[in-house]
Amino acid sequence: MAARSVSGITRRVFMWTVSGTPCREFWSRFRKEKEPVVVETVEEKKEPILVCPPLRSRAYTPPEDLQSRLESYVKEVFGSSLPSNWQDISLEDSRLKFNLLAHLADDLGHVVPNSRLHQMCRVRDVLDFYNVPIQDRSKFDELSASNLPPNLKITWSY
């Protein structure tokens, strides 16, 4: 017999034995053994995760016929009859504004960033945005290409 003390109370615990084996071992023979479930694993090829996103090329030069392209898209989105001052058309309707900017982004390959969307109030603002050329050079590239004083040098390998 074994004695066990639980929080100050002494109880006697009997270990049942059936034909020389403890109770747990006796009844375990009658339990059905569960077969291990085998889960099929499907290997998917995943692209490697980049630590930082690749630099995107942002170079943009406005085309020569930008004004005529913009005018044709404005006619397509706002209707064929345009006033003489078509550049002063308001872009308050967000659906029309989206359609116009989406057509221009597809055609020119240059998208208006989210931070500048609220500044596009009139067609003139869109024309001014697309008239600005963007170079794909960093400030360090510009500094190394410019004429530097003799005491200033940019060394890329350090």
From Swiss-Prot:
Domain of life of the source: Eukaryota
GO BP field: mitochondrial translation
Protein keywords: Mitochondrion, Ribonucleoprotein, Ribosomal protein
InterPro entries: Ribosomal_m50 (IPR018305)
Major subcellular location class: mitochondrion
A single GO cellular-component term on record: cytosol
Location(s) in or outside the cell: Mitochondrion
Record text on subunit structure and interactions: Component of the mitochondrial large ribosomal subunit (mt-LSU). Mature mammalian 55S mitochondrial ribosomes consist of a small (28S) and a large (39S) subunit. The 28S small subunit contains a 12S ribosomal RNA (12S mt-rRNA) and 30 different proteins. The 39S large subunit contains a 16S rRNA (16S mt-rRNA), a copy of mitochondrial valine transfer RNA (mt-tRNA(Val)), which plays an integral structural role, and 52 different proteins.
Record-stated family: Belongs to the mitochondrion-specific ribosomal protein mL50 family.
Protein name: Large ribosomal subunit protein mL50
Source organism of this protein record: Homo sapiens
